[in-house]
């Protein structure tokens, strides 16, 4: 299955030497079981000094933002694909 969503983006990793004072996990609570058909865009924040695991933030079609469980098998595939595509375009 193809998981390219129109609003998908992978921001660059946080630069610890850049003085980013907001170095912490964005996703404290995650949800699994959200169907991709309800998602309008995705944002992947890779693991780094700010957070030990990747974070997957979904914007639902109704406008709500939620954090998806990065350990969910389906979401792991999405994260892997998005991070791979970022490396290819960098």
UniProtKB/Swiss-Prot annotation:
Disordered: annotated segments: 1-20
Superkingdom: Eukaryota
Keywords for the protein's UniProt record, in alphabetical order: Chemotaxis, Cytokine, Disulfide bond, Glycoprotein, Heparin-binding, Phosphoprotein, Pyrrolidone carboxylic acid, Secreted
Main location: secreted
Modification sites for Pyrrolidone carboxylic acid: 1
InterPro entries reported for this sequence: Chemokine_b/g/d (IPR039809), Chemokine_CXC (IPR001089), Chemokine_CXC_CS (IPR018048), Chemokine_IL8-like_dom (IPR001811), CXC_Chemokine_domain (IPR033899), Interleukin_8-like_sf (IPR036048)
Keyword Phosphoprotein: yes
Family assignment from sequence similarity: Belongs to the intercrine alpha (chemokine CxC) family.
Complexes and interactors: Homotetramer. Interacts with TNFAIP6 (via Link domain). Interacts with CCR1. Interacts with CXCR3. Interacts with THBD; this interaction enhances generation of activated protein C.
Protein name, per record: Platelet factor 4
């Amino acid at each position: 299955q193809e998981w390219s969503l129109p609003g998908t983006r992978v921001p660059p990793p946080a630069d610890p030497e850049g003085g980013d004072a907001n170095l912490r996990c964005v996703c404290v609570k995650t949800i699994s079981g959200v169907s991709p058909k309800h998602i309008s865009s995705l944002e992947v924040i890779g693991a780094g000094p700010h957070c030990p695991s990747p974070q997957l933030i979904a914007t639902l079609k109704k406008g709500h933002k939620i954090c998806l469980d990065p350990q969910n098998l389906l979401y792991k595939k999405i994260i892997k694909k998005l991070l791979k595509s970022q490396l290819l375009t960098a």
